[in-house]
């Protein structure tokens, strides 16, 4: 059976450092570094990934590229007296992934839209870039779409902030079930944060 165009795109993005994507990214990152932290884009950079996550080229759907810093928490040094070990500066791992943070920022920037999903598009030594698919649940073309009409329901408000996207579910430990996951449901906080 003949491969589709999406299959070739997916294959190229599987190992971007070993395919023709490497040269493309090298050029793109030079432009992206000079841009703002949240930029609306005309077309998804990875069309195969976007479509597999629910993207459709229609009104009411927008793709934004979000730049986010790499690394752990960057906390300011305390000026009050305490031992250096108790300053809470080093080895503080955030409970959220950078992808979740990117989704939340995009969602806050476009308050009338909900984050459907997101995917990685590039990184360098200092930053990571994610593209977030945003959907306006009250747009007529979305309301009449049987695959996306559920977003109009008020229970789906603030999806990104409540960890309901794919990246959010992963960060909350919802990808695994059964033995060893007793403290992840109904939520991490309900078990005094012992689930992670």
From Swiss-Prot:
One of its GO terms (cellular component) is cytosolic large ribosomal subunit. Keywords: Ribonucleoprotein, Ribosomal protein. SMART domains: Ribosomal_L15e (SM01384). The keyword Membrane does not apply. GO terms for biological process: cytoplasmic translation. Residues 186-196 have a biased composition (Basic residues). It holds the Pfam family Ribosomal_L15e. Disulfide bonds: none annotated. Belongs to the eukaryotic ribosomal protein eL15 family. This is Large ribosomal subunit protein eL15. It comes from Methanoculleus marisnigri (strain ATCC 35101 / DSM 1498 / JR1).
